[in-house]
UniProtKB/Swiss-Prot annotation:
GO annotation, biological process: detection of stimulus involved in sensory perception; monoatomic ion transmembrane transport; sensory perception of chemical stimulus
Highest taxon listed in the record's lineage: Eukaryota
Gene responsible for this protein: tmc-1
Name assigned to this protein: Transmembrane channel-like protein 1
Coiled-coil boundaries: none
Residue positions the entry lists as glycosylated: N209
Organism: Caenorhabditis elegans
Length: 1285
């Protein structure tokens, strides 16, 4: 209250005494506004007016503003408050719905006030305000500068100006994916890669020896590590890099002082990345949901308005794109019109149905073919040293080809289906999405099958600890004194199969072994490990060891030769135990005798060369002879060393072709990581190739060949390449799914993906601006942004399933990765929990984690989810119902407002009201309202007009002689002609009260009254009925009485007995609403609307008939010969009104002031009495048909007749009157003996006499009507009328 009083005082202070009328109206409006509760806009509005709106006003009111309402100078607090108000005005100015001129003027005034008064508070305060101002400017400048730091913002804006916001949404989505991958990469780098690298940089000798096999490439692989095929396979140096799983050590802790658990960190980082991805996607979807407009229901209500007024893209800055957008809007409008006109059930077409079935069969066959190709490629993929590029990379090549080629084939197949363009687009997107999903699932299953085979192979070679130690050392640890060159990791069975399948024996005529008497032993020409140069063979009398592996070592292979026969010293025959040798030698051989051979002495080495055509590759073998072991009864052999070169022929199948030889052990996690990284890389290459071939080369061909080609290739086929936003977004989603899938096996895969996405950003942007055109059918990003994010969320869920299966079910590799020490991947978490949690609590946790508790919890969560879905569905339905209710109420309120304002109803509303009113109209009333009656019913139907008992007393002979009733035109008045505004009935008592009076300004002649310039609606009989002659013996009396107010409830109470008796059911509803009426055309003909003609509710439609331009006509009875009674009389003045000039402004102002004057009305009843005449008097009578429940009898008394005689004496004392009928009162006749003819007055929408019934001005007036008057009443607080004397 104090604030309101202060504002009021400010208004008084700043209001000059010599203000003009407009300024006073402003201050009056402000005073009215101050009395109510002000909103923020009102406060700002008052502040602006309180401090003035012009510079002159500010200069003149400075002295007054420096004082408060008491005249005292303003205190510092008050001045600060005013300064705060001004700052609030400046801060909220941008949000005001004002014109720009007013905003600038207000800003200027507020700033000027602050400049003048801020220094008066205190200098320190002024400095603080200046600092705040500078800080705001810096903040704003920094916010503007940040826009330049957003990556690719200018490129995206340029694309948006040429192609619109739909195409730019793809690049915005791509940029968001890049940001997400950058965050994932930072998480992996900080918590996994960086600790491992730091630990290696300060590693001691023990850690170096433990991790050397994982982090350093072996010497045999270093030779080929820089070859293109090895690098393309992500092998060589890349395999032993932090890119893959196998690089990381399995030490429980890193560092001595700061113990960092890398296995636990690796596990938790994987979970954190998936959680962050979920959070980022859901947060983006929520932001889009908040920013989106809930225009679904609105678009359904106003289809064409939304498409027309919101279909334009204001970001377009290119003329060609603008013309394309115009055509797109036109096409959408045509499609909407076609959809509206299209029948619900289209005609069945057999050919079209057959084509659609055939197209779906082809698409399903292509999906099956893609599944077969992926499975076949995964199963047959091998890492080879030779072969073409496709055989080395079958899996990524096949998957990328299917991803890029099949969607284009789907698009071509979809054209034969002849769907609606919008339906065809959605079907194509659905098929592409199904293709990506099927390929993804197939690839996962194929990789898991391959992984299972690799794990089984690893498990078969790790049956004992000795085998595991030998496999881990692999023969290449220089710190160990062993092993010999033939140390093997292979299994005995595998080695035997390998040798049996890949070894060819020499065919010689002589014996294969030669025994010399002088030598203690015999050396076979074929023995020892394969492919070893300069062999040193040792014959042992011990157990044969068959576990070995061949290695590719040393320089180039030596040529094939056959050693010359030699003689050896004799020896005693006996058993010779073999430690090693080829499969051609049995374990124990007994030589009974020796066959002497010719001895040839040569100096070693002996080199002989022979040629074998089927040989594929040469291998050199070195054999070393050492001390022999002693076994059983075998005799000791002499120590000797034999140097010889032997060559063994190997078939093509014996060449090393699998990946087992590239590493000392099989690390299946790294192998899967390599496959996924190759998929991502191959997808980038295929994307670049598709852009070059499909977009660039096609664009060049069309540009330079369209002028001379045999058909129009620019507009028909192949056209310029379209940038398909939806397909490209699905491609990005598929690529991101691969990243999430391979994240566990390759921690730095998101970094590679960032490089790929950046390349895509630039090459796609270049292709769009150079080669592409906007697509004809647009899948709008504004409506489908959450659709894309929803697909991305589903893809993330699909990626978490296989990774979760690996973590929960698979056993890690024993020789690589951070989980090599554990039985399962999740064991690292369980062990940490066991270390840090009490056993009692741990037992409870185990019980809770048991299936007996987890399964019910899962079921309970499913029920909760179902309940929430049901709740959301119910709320959505309730929201729909509320929207429908709001729309209905809005429509009804609009209709009421238009009715109150005199608006018209449209055809639909009229028909609806007509249908509603039929439920409450009696049958006799419906017959009376038939449209043909106003044209063809020559005489009033007594059966339909009235059922009054007094009508039977009327003399029927009076109908023989009739006289037409005519009405004189109205007298001209000094008011401008204007159209009468028709208002609907409003159920209040004030609608029946007349508030205006009009002075009698009849001319001295009084013969002719010109027609008024108004369009008045009159529900009455037709012209033919108006001109029917009536009997001259009958007389017509018009009774005038004061208006009696009747509420709608009273009218319903009067109608209820009749309706219950008529229909036999209790009447429940009254008159729901009174229909409005429309004004007639300029010819002033009565309304012919059947629903309003002779309607019983028309009384309330026009409750104010004494408008300022309206004067009731006077009905005069004329003496006419009986012979002339049937003759129709017309007057030119009845057809068209006389010309009346518009009144001047002074006349209109005087008339308005005269209308505002308040004059008490006559409350006495006046009647019109017919003057006595000799003989038969001819009267004009009209009997419109009236329903039973709306008929009123108007009668007069002798006192009224006498009063009429006194009122009609002088011409100057004649006053106009209005025929007003009370809907609930019937006046009984005063004298029954007197012959009277009653006029059954009908409740019409206007009480004025229609122009069709205007009397002939040439006839003598026999009836003089009193002036139009009505009692003046006022209303109390209970809405009850009270008459004013």
């Amino acid at each position: 209250m104090q604030e309101a009083a202060r504002r009021a005082s400010l208004r008084k202070e700043h209001t000059p005494t010599n203000e003009k009328f407009g300024d006073l109206s402003k201050q009056d409006s402000l005073g009215e506004r101050a009395s109510s509760k002000l909103t923020l806009d009102d406060e700002l509005y008052d502040i602006l007016y309180a401090f003035g709106e012009t510079d002159a006003f500010i200069n003149k009111g400075d002295k007054q503003r420096e004082t408060d309402e008491d005249g005292n100078p303003l205190t510092r607090q008050a001045l600060l408050e005013r300064i705060r108000q001004k700052k609030e005005v400046i801060g909220k100015l941008r949000c005001q719905a004002w014109s720009m001129t007013r905003k600038r003027r207000t800003l200027k005034l507020a700033q000027k006030y602050l400049e003048q008064h801020e220094s008066k508070v205190s200098r320190s305060h002024l400095y603080m305000e200046e600092m705040r101002k500078r800080a705001r400017l810096m903040k704003r400048s920094f916010s503007n500068f940040k826009t330049y730091l957003i990556p690719w913002e200018s490129k995206i804006k340029r694309i948006e100006s040429h192609f619109g916001s739909v195409v730019s949404s793809y690049f915005t989505f791509l940029r968001w994916i890049v940001f997400v991958n950058i965050m994932i990469t930072l998480i992996a780098l900080v918590f996994v890669v960086l600790p491992e690298t730091l630990a290696d940089s300060v590693a001691n000798e023990g850690r170096f020896n433990r991790t050397k096999t994982r982090k350093q490439i072996p010497a045999n692989e270093r030779v080929h590590a820089d070859e293109l095929a090895v690098v393309w396979h992500y092998d060589g140096y890349l395999r032993y890099s932090p890119l893959f799983y196998g690089y990381y050590s399995d030490d429980p802790f890193l560092g001595n002082k700061i113990k960092y658990a890398l296995p636990l960190a690796y596990f938790m980082v994987t979970l954190t990345i998936f959680a962050y991805s979920f959070f980022a996607i859901l947060r983006k979807m929520a932001a889009n949901a908040r920013m989106s407009k809930l225009s679904g229901s609105k678009a359904e209500q106003y289809i064409f308005n939304w498409k027309l007024f919101t279909g334009w893209d204001y970001t377009i800055g290119n003329s060609e794109t603008a013309s394309n957008t115009v055509m797109a809007v036109v096409i959408k409008l045509r499609e909407s019109i076609a959809d509206i006109k299209k029948d619900a059930h289209g005609k069945f077409r057999l050919l079209q149905f057959s084509l659609r079935v055939f197209a779906n069969i082809i698409i399903c066959a292509m999906l099956g073919f893609s599944i077969y190709c992926i499975i076949f490629a995964v199963q047959k993929s091998q890492v080879q040293d030779d072969g073409n590029l496709f055989t080395k990379n079958q899996v990524p090549s096949v998957v990328s080809t299917i991803t890029h080629v099949f969607p284009m084939i789907f698009d071509l197949i979809g054209k034969m289906e002849n769907y609606h363009p919008r339906t065809a687009l959605r079907a194509h997107l659905g098929r592409v999405l199904i293709l990506y999903t099927v390929n993804y699932i197939t690839l996962i299953f194929a990789l898991f099958e391959k992984m299972t085979a690799l794990r089984d192979r690893v498990n078969s070679t790790s049956t004992s600890s000795s085998h595991r130690t030998k496999r881990q050392q692999g023969g290449w640890n220089p710190n160990m004194q062993r092993p010999p060159p033939y140390a093997s990791r292979a299994e005995v069975r595998q080695m035997s199969d390998f040798l049996a399948a890949n070894t060819r024996r020499f065919q010689t005529v002589s014996q294969r072994t030669t025994r010399s008497v002088t030598t203690p032993f015999t050396v076979a020409p074929q023995f020892g490990p394969f492919n070893v140069n300069n062999p040193n063979a040792v014959f042992h009398n011990g157990t044969h060891s068959t576990s070995f592996e061949s290695q590719i070592l040393g320089p180039k292979a030596l040529p094939i030769f056959t050693p010359p026969p030699r003689k050896y010293p004799g020896f005693t025959p006996g058993n010779v135990g073999q430690q090693f040798g080829g499969p051609d030698f049995p374990r124990n051989q007994v030589y009974t005798k020796s066959t002497p051979l010719p001895r040839v002495r040569t100096k070693p080495p002996w080199v002989y060369t022979t040629t074998h055509p089927p040989l594929v590759q040469n291998r050199a073998m070195t054999t070393t002879m050492s001390k022999s072991a002693k076994k059983g009864n075998s005799k000791n052999l002499d120590d000797d060393i034999l140097l010889s070169n032997e060559t063994i022929q190997m078939s093509e199948a014996a060449l090393r072709r699998n990946h087992d030889g590239h590493n000392n052990d099989i690390c299946w996690e790294t192998i899967i990581g390599q496959e996924i990284v190759k998929l991502v890389t191959m997808d980038l290459i295929f994307t670049i190739l598709s852009i070059l071939v499909i977009d660039l080369f096609r664009g060049l061909w069309i540009k330079y060949c369209s002028s001379w080609w045999c058909w129009d290739i620019e507009t028909t086929f192949p056209e310029y390449g379209e940038f398909k936003v939806a397909e490209n977004v699905l491609h990005i989603i598929n690529n991101q799914g691969m990243i999430w899938l391979g994240l566990f096996f390759a921690p730095l895969l998101p970094a590679i993906n960032n490089i790929k996405l950046i390349i895509l950003m630039y090459i796609r942007g270049w292709a769009v601006m150079t080669c592409n055109v906007p697509a004809r059918e647009i899948f709008r990003a504004s409506r489908s942004s959450n659709f894309y994010l929803g697909i991305l969320l589903i893809w993330l869920l699909l990626c978490t399933l296989p990774v979760g299966f690996v973590i929960a079910s698979m056993s890690p590799s024993r020789s690589c990765g951070p989980f090599a020490r554990y039985q399962h991947f999740y064991t690292v978490v369980t062990r940490e929990i066991e270390k840090r949690v009490d056993q009692t609590v741990l037992s409870y946790i185990r019980h809770i984690a048991s299936p007996g508790v987890v399964i019910p919890i899962i079921l309970f969560l499913i029920l909760i989810i179902y309940f929430l879905f049901s709740l959301v569905r119910g709320l959505r339905e309730a929201n729909t119902d509320l929207q429908a209710q709001l729309v209905h109420e809005r429509t009804e309120e609009k209709k009421k407002i238009f009715e109150l304002a005199g608006g018209k109803k449209n055809k639909f509303e009229k028909d609806r009201d007509k249908k509603r009113s039929n439920d409450y109209i009696p049958l006799i009333e419906q017959r009376r309202r038939e449209p043909w009656r106003q044209y063809h019913e020559m005489e009033a139907d007594h059966a339909l007009a009235s059922d009054s008992s007094e009508e039977s007393d009327i003399n029927e002979d009076e109908d023989d002689e009739r006289q037409p009733l005519t009405a004189y035109p109205l007298r001209a008045i000094e008011t401008p002609p204007e159209t009468l505004q028709v208002t609907a009935f409003h159920p209040s008592l004030g609608s029946l009260i007349e508030n205006r009076e009009m002075e009698d300004e009849e001319s001295a002649s009084g013969d002719q009254l010109p027609m008024i310039h108004k369009s008045v609606s009159f529900q009455g009989p037709s012209h033919m009925q108006m001109r029917q002659s009536i009997s001259t013996e009958s007389c017509s009396q018009i009774s005038r009485s004061a208006i009696q107010v009747a509420t709608p409830e009273e009218i319903r109470a009067l109608l209820r007995p009749y309706l219950e008796a008529k229909y036999g059911i209790p009447y429940q509803h009254g008159i729901k609403s009174f229909p409005i009426d429309v004004h007639t055309p300029p010819n002033n003909t009565p309304s012919r609307r059947s629903s309003k003609y002779n309607s019983f509710v028309s009384l309330y439609e026009h409750t104010r008939d004494d408008h300022k331009n309206f004067v009731a006509s006077t009905i005069k009875e004329t003496d006419e010969d009986p012979g002339k009674s049937d003759k129709k009389q017309t007057s030119s003045k009845d057809v068209a009104p006389d010309f009346m000039p518009w009144p001047s402004a002074d006349e209109a102002r005087a008339l308005r002031e005269k209308m505002k004057s308040k004059t008490p009305l006559m409350l006495t009843k006046t009647t019109v009495e017919e003057k006595p005449k000799g003989g038969k008097s001819s009267e004009s009578e009209f009997r419109p048909p009236v329903p039973i429940h709306r008929k009123y009898n108007i009668q007069t008394t002798e006192e009224e007749n006498e009063e009429e005689e006194t009122d009609s004496a002088p011409e100057s004392s004649k006053k106009r009157f209005r025929i007003s009928v009370s809907p609930t009162k019937t006046i009984a006749p005063a004298s029954a003996s007197r012959a009277q003819h009653k006029i059954v007055s009908q409740a019409s929408s206007s009480s004025s006499i229609p122009h069709g019934r205007q009397p002939d001005p040439n006839k003598k007036a026999s009836l003089v009507l009193p002036p139009l008057r009505a009692p003046r009443v006022q209303f109390d607080e209970d809405d009850s009328p009270r008459q004013i004397d």
